[in-house]
Amino acid sequence: MDSPPLANVLTLGVQNIDSERAFYAALGWPVVFDSDEFVVFELRGALLALFPAHQLAVDARAAAEPRQGGIRSAVIIAASEPDEVDHWVGRARQAGATVTKPPTTAQFFEGRDAYFADPEGNYWEVAWAPADNPVTAAALRAAGLSQS
C-alpha cells in the first residue's frame, strides 16, 4: 500500500447524458459501455465515464453543485507531438466544442497547448511538452508508456 494508487477512470457529472455522449462519440473515442444511465469511453491509459450529475451527487452523498460557468478544473490530453494539439482541437471544434484557447506556444511550460470546453462547459487542455519535461515523463510512466 506504499505505492501510489491506480487512478485511471475520470467520471464527469453531466446534465444531459445524450448530448455529452454524442459529443465524445464525435471525437472518435471508443465506447466500452453504454446504457441509459451512463456511458464509458476508452482513452489511451484511462477511461472517461459520463454519469448524470444528480445521480453522482446521490452516490457520493454530496450536494450537486450548480454550474456557475467559468473554469475550475481541466483534464489534460497529453499529445505525443506538437501537431497532435491541433488535431484534437480541430476534432473537438467539429464535434461542437467551444475552443477557448487556440493551439499556441504554452505560457507556463516549454511546449504547445490549447483549451476547449465540451457542450456542458467541462474543460480539456490538449498539451504537448518535450519528453524531458518532468511532468511529461511522469505522465508517460503513469500510463505505462515509459520504462524510466
Regions found by a protein language model. Give the residues of each.
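Vicinal oxygen chelate
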Residues: 1-9, 27-82, 86-117, 130-148
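Amphipathic alpha-helical segments
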Residues: 15-30
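Residues within well-ordered beta-strands of beta-sheet-rich folds
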Residues: 11-13
